[in-house]
């Protein structure tokens, strides 16, 4: 059986401060750095050997991937970065404290923005300091592709081509794959892999630690699912 290991990035500085992060390129906290290292140690203890790895273009996921692979003594494994694995874009909520947003917009509205499958948060202003439209890492993308806000539905729509073009073919080829990504980009792919309904995915949480493992047969049927170390 082939293995797909999802590692959500370790705690970021904005996770720690309870801020909406999205596409803002925020670093790992000290705790998050240790979580990434511990993830790698769990991988090594489980005897999982990777053939390739994928991550986003955001430093918290890139660093988590590198730290985990290093701790697993597999830093040589090829890593491909893609914006399609980025966190969900939180639009105009980016940088806001979650508790303060609830006070401003109401608990129910913020809950809907965060947890619903297809409701979009307010757009991010084009001149916002965190706007991806002026970020050099997205210069090769058509401007119309760069989001100003996303829900989980849109996140899945842009992550799915990467699954179909990169991750799934590697698994079908018998390769073990590491994906260092984000809570919502992982949730989106989990929805697709497990064929969860729009309502079912609302209750799925992906922790910063430990890594989540999926095992597949040669036809890419899901055989088992578990968290390392649990």
Curated annotation (Swiss-Prot):
Identify the stretch annotated as signal peptide in this record.
none
**Which Pfam family, giving just one, matches this sequence?**
His_Phos_1
User: Which EC numbers does the record give?
Assistant: 5.4.2.11
Residues the record marks as site: Transition state stabilizer: 182
CDD domains in alphabetical order: HP_PGM_like
Xref: InterPro entries: His_Pase_superF_clade-1, His_PPase_superfam, Phosphogly_mut1
GO terms in the biological process aspect are: gluconeogenesis; glycolytic process
User: Where are the catalytic residues?
Assistant: 9 (tele-phosphohistidine intermediate), 87 (proton donor/acceptor)
Keyword Protein transport listed? no
Kindly tell me the pathway this chain contributes to: Carbohydrate degradation; glycolysis; pyruvate from D-glyceraldehyde 3-phosphate: step 3/5
Q: A GO molecular-function term, please?
A: phosphoglycerate mutase activity
Going by the entry's taxonomy, the superkingdom of the source organism is recorded as: Bacteria
Q: Give residues annotated as binding substrate.
A: 8-15, 21-22, 60, 87-90, 98, 114-115, 183-184
Q: Which reaction does it catalyse?
A: (2R)-2-phosphoglycerate = (2R)-3-phosphoglycerate
Keyword field: Gluconeogenesis, Glycolysis, Isomerase
PANTHER family with a match to the protein in the record: PHOSPHOGLYCERATE MUTASE (PTHR11931)
Q: Which NCBIfam families match?
A: pgm_1, PRK14115.1, PRK14117.1
The entry assigns this protein to a family as follows: Belongs to the phosphoglycerate mutase family. BPG-dependent PGAM subfamily.
Role description: Catalyzes the interconversion of 2-phosphoglycerate and 3-phosphoglycerate.
- The name under which this protein is listed is 2,3-bisphosphoglycerate-dependent phosphoglycerate mutase
Which species is listed as the source? Streptococcus agalactiae serotype V (strain ATCC BAA-611 / 2603 V/R)
Taxonomic lineage of the native organism: Bacteria, Bacillati, Bacillota, Bacilli, Lactobacillales
Gene name per UniProt: gpmA
